[in-house]
Amino acid sequence: MRVPVLRLCWAAVVLAGGLMVDSASAGDTLVFDPPHPGDSVKHIVLISGDEEYRSEETMPMLAKILSQKHGFKCTVLFAFGPDGADYIDSNNQKGLRGLKSLDSADLMIIATRFRRPDAEQAKHITAFLDAGKPVIGLRTATHAFQGGERFGDSLTYDQFGLKILGEQWVSHHGRHKAEGARSVVEPGVESHVILNGVSDVFAPSDVYGVTHLTNADTILLRGGITESLDPESKILAYDDRNKPMQPFAWLHPYTIPNGKEGRSFCTTAGASLDFVDEDLRRLVVNASVYLTGGQVPEKADVGYVDPFYPTFFSFINDKDYYKTMNMKPEDFGLGKTPHRPDPPGNPAWPFRPVPEAK
């Protein structure tokens, strides 16, 4: 069974002024060139691969916005099935391919969970970090890798989140799949450019516990536990779990031995469903521009380039699910919109776009 992919009429997806250009899929990667390529264009590599939060949906959507509306070249990486399979399999912790793309990257956006790249793939992450290049971590990037293998001589896979992003896996701070999270700006940083045009992030995936940040970190947003998964639900003002609210987005300085000092941005939001929220998309776009030395717009355009139909976050225990879906990188190219049913057993969430019934 092939996952349904909605191919849009080209006239319907071309924006005024010829904004959109075709995307090129080179083997296992998905590449989006900007409308006006050139030597000064910055390159972002977006790495998907997690078992629960559908980063394989999120990263192509963000790459389209960053490339077509903000002038970046974007390369999206995926996890694939075992034994050289050509289908995307986000459950395969050893399935990452294409990390060589980091050799020419100016920014890495990562949303993986407990990945175990082999030494040949890992060396590209090592070189990227040794150069002190910037990193954006989404949601499970706090536990992006697992195991005692190393990036270079001293940074184990297990240490990536804590050392590079400032935090590791701690806990779910709200009731998962029952309570969401709403952002509150940290006092004193209201004028930070990463918050330009960002008013109110709501994430149905909830907020993580965050306990390891230090005075070297700059907290931009805190996340308050909300009454429900409804985007209009209020923060539980008198709940002790919101005293204090957990850090939700922050900047972190990192250094690894033999490497230069670098900077990272992390948010514990990041399920594909969370990115229905325009303010979250803007937060990540702003951080991308900021970390690559650009001028952050007052209110960045973060409208979808193609329709976006995220599925509900959930672990998928069917070992044949991804093989049956048979999704390929090119299914996420420009003018294409994959759509899958939610995994069974999840709550209804009618606050997202869905394809029109035929």
Where are these regions (language model features)?
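N-terminal secretory signal peptides that target proteins for export/translocation
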Residues: 1-5
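Bacterial N-terminal signal peptides
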Residues: 9-22
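Extracellular ligand-binding/catalytic regions of CAZymes and related secreted enzymes
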Residues: 27-39, 57-58, 68-69, 228-358
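Catalytic beta-strand/loop cores that center a nucleophilic Ser/Cys/Thr
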Residues: 29, 67, 73, 93, ...
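Helical hinge/lid and interdomain linker segments adjacent to catalytic or ligand-binding clefts
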Residues: 30-35, 45-47, 51-144
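Nucleotide donor/acceptor-binding cores
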Residues: 42
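Oxidoreductase and adenylate-handling cofactor-binding alpha/beta cores
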Residues: 65, 156-161, 165-168, 187, ...
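A glycine-rich, often tryptophan-bearing local segment used as a flexible ligand/cofactor-contacting loop or short
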Residues: 101, 110, 114-197
